[in-house]
Amino acid sequence: MSSDQFTLSVIIPAWNEGDYLPDTLASLEHAIQSLPNEVACEVIVVDNASSDNTRSIALSRGACVIFEPERRIARVRNAGAEAAKGDGLVFLDADTRIRATHLTAVVAGLRAGLAGGGVPIDFDHLEGALQSAGLRAWNALSRRAHWAAGCFVFARADLHRAVGGFSEAVYAGEEIAYSRALKRLAQHQGRAFRILDIQPVVSSSRKITWFRPWQHAIVLLTFLFFPWAGRFKRLTWFWYHRPHDG
């Protein structure tokens, strides 16, 4: 990559995210303002057939909006990447707030030769020691295994294309397969796929509120004993169902 001009594309998959997207875009706008002058940044919101005001919110904040009808998160991420013009890609969830340091660290890492990576995560509301312990366990596993959380994944655009993007064979867990694929390719090229040592991004804890502990346990056990569950839409309801949808 050139040591001079650099373009970053931030891709936000969004399905009915009118309640969360404004805060995410506000945090992103602040972060973009802190980037060096030689770094350009485009924001792409992928409207996944929303029925609320997601599209109008994104347009009002100056984002490029593209439409993807298929309800499969990997396809939505890939659609955004296909429209992106950047040297580097950041996949950011619509309910996740970032700091200026996240984008500057990503740009610095990619320009220094990183293949890609992720960041630690936090939630805006946790209740009790069990939830806090679960979060700490994930962040430790993420760093040890080099698995990026889906709410914030970044990569060189050329390497994203080289691994074929996110696997569209699955409905959930695509970020783990993506992390593994990029890590393998990075090793062959003498690069690294790394979880950055930086402050966590902050995601909504809505799934903790929406679903009961026993439902979380079912999801965990399903994927623990049946790792291929992500290939079946019925078994990935946790990522696609919202209680108020009925």
Segments and roles (model prediction):
Residues 68-84:
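Glycine-rich, basic loop-to-helix element that forms the pyrophosphate-binding segment
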